């Protein structure tokens, strides 16, 4: 009996279906799995909504102010919006590991679909839920803090936050991929993510970071560029006006003008900086 070339090629394939069919069916299956797990979905959405209300109310109206203190409040409001991702990631990882265990026990031995298809399906299904949950967080956070009424400013902020949703979810899944269980995945993620948060220049200014970390980890941290872009968007075209209690009175010595005294002070500061 002769076998055609096409039939022979099909017999030589590792999987019964091509990559596109595998991915389509795997994505559909994971969507159904998520839909049948309302505890995971509701906890994700609830945490985003409550987090947005809590952080937004904590920094109420700070985005509309232009004092020196309000700039710091804007910075920490932005930073706190990113810190929430640690809790969301630790919700995500056990679900991912349960799906992975099922794949390794049943799907991989039976050659239903490949490891790449499994990873892509998990990442794809997380995206719409994270975008929806991130929007639930962003609306109260942005408008309660009053970062700006302009549509361009709001749209840019929302877009950057949606990119961040995809980033932290994929990062958490990548860590869970190499972890044997959810507990170790949580420890690994917290350890690695702490580097991203600590060396982004918010908790400690870049100039005060140790030289070793400042020269590479500060620039490597995605938080550095994300916070910089969001803060640049919030303070663009806004004039900073210090409040009276934020100004320091500088008494001048007798016989010198304010200009002369400040010139001498600047020279002294420059010399000290040069020695340092």
For each predicted feature, which ranges?
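Short, membrane-interfacial amphipathic segments enriched in basic
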Residues: 5-25, 215-222
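Membrane-spanning alpha-helical segments of multipass transporters and channels
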Residues: 35-266, 270-272
């Amino acid at each position: 009996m002769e076998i055609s070339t096409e039939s022979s090629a099909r017999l030589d394939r590792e999987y019964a279906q091509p990559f596109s069919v595998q991915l389509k069916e795997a994505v559909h299956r994971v969507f159904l799995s998520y839909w049948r797990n309302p505890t995971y979905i509701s906890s994700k959405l609830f945490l985003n909504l409550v987090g947005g209300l809590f952080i937004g109310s904590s920094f109420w109206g700070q985005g509309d102010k232009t004092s020196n203190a309000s700039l710091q409040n804007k910075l920490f409001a932005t930073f706190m919006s990113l810190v929430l991702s640690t809790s969301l990631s630790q919700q995500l990882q056990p679900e991912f590991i349960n799906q992975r265990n099922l794949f390794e026990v049943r799907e991989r031995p039976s050659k239903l679909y490949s490891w790449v298809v499994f990873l892509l399906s998990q990442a794809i299904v997380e995206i719409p839920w994270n975008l929806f949950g991130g929007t639930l967080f962003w609306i109260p956070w942005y408008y309660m803090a009053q970062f700006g009424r302009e549509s361009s400013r709001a749209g840019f902020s929302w877009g950057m936050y949606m990119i961040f949703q995809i980033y932290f979810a994929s990062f958490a899944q990548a860590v869970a991929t190499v972890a044997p269980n959810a507990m170790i995945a949580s420890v690994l993620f917290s350890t690695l993510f702490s580097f991203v948060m600590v060396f982004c220049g918010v908790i400690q200014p870049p100039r005060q970071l140790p030289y070793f970390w400042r020269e590479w980890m500060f620039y490597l941290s995605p938080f550095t560029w994300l916070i910089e872009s969001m803060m640049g968007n919030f303070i663009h075209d806004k004039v900073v006006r210090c409040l009276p209690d934020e100004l320091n009175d500088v008494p001048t010595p007798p016989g010198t003008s304010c200009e002369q005294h400040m010139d001498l002070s600047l020279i002294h500061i420059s010399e000290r900086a040069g020695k340092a």
